[in-house]
UniProtKB/Swiss-Prot annotation:
<comment type="similarity">
    <text>Belongs to the UPF0502 family.</text>
</comment>
<dbReference type="InterPro" id="IPR036390">
    <property type="entry name" value="WH_DNA-bd_sf"/>
</dbReference>
<dbReference type="InterPro" id="IPR036388">
    <property type="entry name" value="WH-like_DNA-bd_sf"/>
</dbReference>
<protein>
    <recommendedName>
        <fullName>UPF0502 protein KPK_3478</fullName>
    </recommendedName>
</protein>
<dbReference type="Pfam" id="PF04337">
    <property type="entry name" value="DUF480"/>
</dbReference>
<dbReference type="InterPro" id="IPR007432">
    <property type="entry name" value="DUF480"/>
</dbReference>
Length: 217
């Protein structure tokens, strides 16, 4: 995988992507602003508590890797940072507004269903319907320069499958684990087997009731 981010690096990039769209008047961000964004109690899963020193180290590393760049001058004595992760002049990763919203939300909140993504990403991009969200996810999962997202097996009792991003360095291991845990049968096969078993149980119960009735006579 080309993009090998740690969880903390993913949080920093996600925050810069988010603030670039939602609060452009405050962008680029200072170190203090990045710390505040990383440690937000809302719209973050998991909630982190990164120190200024930790964030500065992350920023320096990401600048060296050309995922961020520093911005100074024009009367600003404080160094600020802007993302070059996607849609930058010389970068390879080009994303639509909908793709940026989905990727950012996944970076900040982990695996989510299409419904959750549509609701949580609406400040960055207003999806017209669920079909648009699913189309964006499908595109990110099948890109020639990707894949950038993957669908997880549906959890028991859940109507929707969750999707995860593939930008972190431990994702290959996670995908292997998920595939090993995936059910061998799809939902339709499992449902058919359950219905067949329920029918057999009902038939056995009826035969038992009939037998008990005859014994009672």
């Amino acid at each position: 995988m080309k993009y090998q981010l740690t969880a903390h690096e993913a949080r920093v990039i996600g925050c810069l992507l988010e603030k670039q769209v939602t609060t452009p008047e405050q962008y680029p961000l200072s170190v203090n602003a990045v710390v505040t964004a990383c440690n937000q109690k809302t719209n973050r899963e998991p909630v982190m508590s990164l120190s200024e020193g930790e964030v500065q180290t992350l920023l320096d590393t990401l600048v060296k890797r050309h995922y961020l760049r520093t911005v100074s001058g024009f009367g600003n004595r404080v160094t600020k940072y802007e993302q070059r992760f996607c849609n930058s002049e010389f970068g390879d990763l080009k994303l639509s507004a909908g793709e940026v919203a989905v990727v950012t939300t996944l970076l900040l909140r982990g695996a989510q269903t299409p419904g959750e993504l549509r609701s949580r990403a609406q400040r960055m991009h207003e999806f017209s319907d669920m079909a648009e969200v699913e189309s964006v996810l499908e595109g990110l999962a099948t890109r020639e320069d990707g894949p950038f997202v993957a669908r997880l097996p549906r959890e028991p009792g859940k109507r929707e499958s969750r999707y995860m991003h593939l930008f972190c360095d431990d994702m290959d291991t996670l995908i292997t684990t998920v595939e090993a845990l995936s059910p061998l049968e799809d939902d339709d096969d499992l449902r058919a087997r359950v219905e067949a078993l329920e029918g057999e149980v009902a038939e056995l119960k009826a035969r038992l009731d009939s037998l008990l009735h005859h014994l009672g006579d």
